[in-house]
A protein has these predicted regions:
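Allosteric regulatory "coupling" segments in signal-transduction proteins
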Residues: 80, 128-134, 171-175
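A structural signal for short, well-ordered beta-strand segments
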Residues: 16, 66, 109-115, 186
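Catalytic strand-loop-helix junctions within cyclic-nucleotide turnover domains
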Residues: 69-79, 111-130, 150-152
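Alpha-helical scaffold within the catalytic cores of cyclic-nucleotide enzymes
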Residues: 40-56, 72-111, 115, 136-146
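Catalytic NTP-binding/metal-coordinating core of nucleotidyl cyclase/transferase enzymes
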Residues: 4-86
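Cytosolic regulatory/linker segments at or just downstream of nucleotide-handling modules
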Residues: 118-120, 147-187
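Acidic/histidine metal-binding catalytic segments
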Residues: 62-63, 102-112, 152-159
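Intrinsically disordered or compositionally simple regulatory linkers and C-terminal tails
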Residues: 1-8, 184-187
Length: 187
């Protein structure tokens, strides 16, 4: 019953992952919508499976992108590492997918990962509700993803500090992200 649902949510510390299929808009100019949906679903399935294998929560699909988070609703001590493992699994699964697809359908993901506080809850109105994560940390993860090249995983300095002994990562030039007053250090 929509009248009984409470808007808003609860604050949580989460690791947010965004993965976007690079070049899909221009790719879309060449093919019929049915073919686009078929190809896009193959790529989004790869991303979704990688997130679920690491026990992440898929928030939503945003056109040619996926938004997911870790450490909620079930706490995970190793949530930053799980997000990075999911991103790496996406990249490996895409290599496999490319073996199944003609080269004209070879696309790649740009991935961004960040950690911080967010509110998880119902957003919208009684006619249309979404359960989602909202907060600066979520926006920052999105901005990091927007700066990742195809086939690239960018993690924030916060994530790097949490997993530095467990993964190999190199610093890249800090990014000046839209809406951010300070550059974001990424690896």
């Amino acid at each position: 019953n929509p009248d009984e649902l409470q808007m808003g949510g609860r604050r949580a510390q989460i690791t947010t992952l965004f993965a976007d299929v690079r070049g899909f808009t221009s790719f879309g100019e060449k093919y019929e919508p049915e073919q686009l949906v078929s190809i896009l679903n193959r790529y989004l399935s790869v991303a979704a499976n990688a997130v679920l294998e690491q026990e992440g929560t898929i928030d939503k699909f945003l056109g040619d992108a996926i938004m997911a988070w870790f450490n909620a609703p079930i706490p995970q001590q190793d949530h930053p590492l799980r997000a990075v493992k999911a991103a790496l699994a996406m990249m490996h699964a895409i290599d496999t997918l490319h073996g199944e697809l003609e080269s004209e359908f070879h696309l790649s993901f740009g991935v961004g990962i960040h950690y911080g506080a967010a509110v998880l809850g119902l957003i919208g109105n009684k006619m249309r509700l979404d359960y989602t994560a909202i907060g600066d940390s979520v926006t920052t993860a999105k901005r990091i993803q927007e700066n990742a090249a195809g086939g690239q995983i960018l993690i924030s300095n916060d994530i790097y500090q949490m997993i530095s002994g467990q993964v190999k990562a190199s610093p890249v030039e800090p990014i000046q992200a839209k809406g951010k007053s300070q550059p974001i250090r990424v690896y």
